[in-house]
């Protein structure tokens, strides 16, 4: 759903969403007991997709940390209705050097998506016992999703992110 409200920075109010309500948000609600050494992929996007006739599309994909558990956060939303992306997703990409700029592919469970990054928020922390390596890329998602009843939904122009994280905490 579009996000609306007011963001106050240094005492100055900024309207979010505008008259068209075209600001989008994703809530990251994580909890639990995480292992000391963990890796994951995560990506999300939302907005109105022109190839989908202006329908509101949301995308939530992840990998690695849930492999082999039978559960995942993977889902595709169309006009507020959630369609589960069943099974594991396959991620094809590289964050070595400047290769993060190359398109990323995420497939599986009816999803065939491409992510084209335009910015990488790269962070590295190395405190010997505690380490964090994150490549959080922002860019544009496009592709298609096939629903359980066989409808193929093509989408494009969704601004979002995809990340690779490896933490030792």
Mark where each language-model region is:
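Structured soluble/peripheral alpha/beta segments that form catalytic or ligand/cofactor-binding pockets
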Residues: 1-169
């Amino acid at each position: 759903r579009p996000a609306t409200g007011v963001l106050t920075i240094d005492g100055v109010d900024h309207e979010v969403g505008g008259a068209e309500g075209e600001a989008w948000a994703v809530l990251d609600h994580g909890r639990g007991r995480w292992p000391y050494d963990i890796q994951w992929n995560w990506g999300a996007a939302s907005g109105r997709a022109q190839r989908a006739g202006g329908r509101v599309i949301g995308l939530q994909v992840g990998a690695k940390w849930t492999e082999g558990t039978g559960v995942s956060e993977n889902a595709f939303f169309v006009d507020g209705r959630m369609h589960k992306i069943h099974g594991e997703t396959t991620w094809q990409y590289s964050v070595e050097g400047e290769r993060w700029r190359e398109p990323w592919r995420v497939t599986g469970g009816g999803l065939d998506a491409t992510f084209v990054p335009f910015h990488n928020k790269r962070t590295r922390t190395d405190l010997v016992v505690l380490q964090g390596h994150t490549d959080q890329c922002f860019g544009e998602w496009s592709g298609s999703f096939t629903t359980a009843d066989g409808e193929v939904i093509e989408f494009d122009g969704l601004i979002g992110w995809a990340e690779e994280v490896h933490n030792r905490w």
